[in-house]
Amino acid sequence: MARLVRLGGLGVFGALGLAACGADTPPYDSSLPLADGVWVGESAPDEEGAFGRSTVTVSGGKITGSQYVTVQANGSMKGEDYGKDSSGEIANRSAYRAAQKAVSAFDVYARDLIEVGVPADVDVVSGATIAHGQFLEAATEALTESQMAAERGRTGPAGGGSESGGPADG
């Protein structure tokens, strides 16, 4: 019976992972060309209002740069203060360490995307599964926008930031 419960739990988490993918973001097809430029994608917000933002640089049709951040509902980025209480103190060291483990995974996800080239091939870092789901959604959106631009025969300007889902302004 315990085995069935564990498998059932995996099914629920798998369904949640699929549901996390944005309905407006088509699946990423790595066989399609990418337009050069800097592309930004955002995930749907989580239950606390935080969302992931992936900035992907494409040059020569290849992913050459990647950054991933999580933006909290108040607009601040999850960083070294994530997991501290409202006074900026570490009230619970264990919770703070867990929060910081998730934050450290952001750079791992971004680096791995450059290495593997496909968001779905970026492995989950233990302790950062919600961030991974948001990363997948945001990176897929950014790369899909690049592919749609390539299909239209245009490129995004290099450098700068952009609105979600488009080339960055230079």
Where is each model-derived feature located?
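Bacterial N-terminal signal peptides that target proteins for export
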Residues: 1-9
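Bacterial signal peptide processing site
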Residues: 22-25
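Active-site- and interface-proximal helix/loop "cap" or "latch" segments in soluble metabolic
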Residues: 28, 33-36, 45-53, 57-161, ...
